[in-house]
Amino acid sequence: MRDAIIDLLQSQQLPVADLPLILTDFLVAKDADNIVGVIGMERYGAFGLLRSMAVPPGYRNQHIAASLVQELEKRAHSTGIVAMYLLTETASGYFSRKGYSTIQRDQVPGAVKSSSEFSHVCPTSAAVMTKNLTL
């Protein structure tokens, strides 16, 4: 399944070089045997870094991404994550509608900021967003 997830992420021009070997905190949506959506999270203490959300064009506008975000947030909160962070170049409007707020990079907790996603995978032009999961 890891290879199929990587294929989907690459088809959407999302980074894969720094993915963990075991995708414990990744969720997939399937249609029969096909992966039609993926989302992942990296854990940094009480904070989560949402990453690698992708839905192929033929499956968009079917609430797949919304379901994946909602389930990931639910699981994160139930395991002690109090806030989610993300970087995006293309989906800030989408995540704003899901309750995420744009913040400055210097407002991100140090552990999250030192992740490979923040430190060298995503460009500095990417929007930084956060959502409090305890509200």
Residue ranges and their predicted role:
Residues 89-117:
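Conserved active-site alpha-helix within GNAT-family acetyltransferase domains
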Residues 108-135:
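C-terminal "cap" of GNAT-fold acetyltransferases
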Residues 28, 34-43, 47-54:
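Conserved beta-strand in the GNAT
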Residues 1-18, 30, 126-128, 132-135:
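Short amphipathic alpha-helix that is part of the acyltransferase structural core
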Residues 55, 61-74, 86:
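Conserved acetyl-CoA-binding loop-helix of GNAT-fold acetyltransferases
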Residues 1, 46, 90-91:
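A generic "binding-loop/recognition-motif" signal
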Residues 74-90:
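Conserved GNAT acetyl-CoA-binding A-motif
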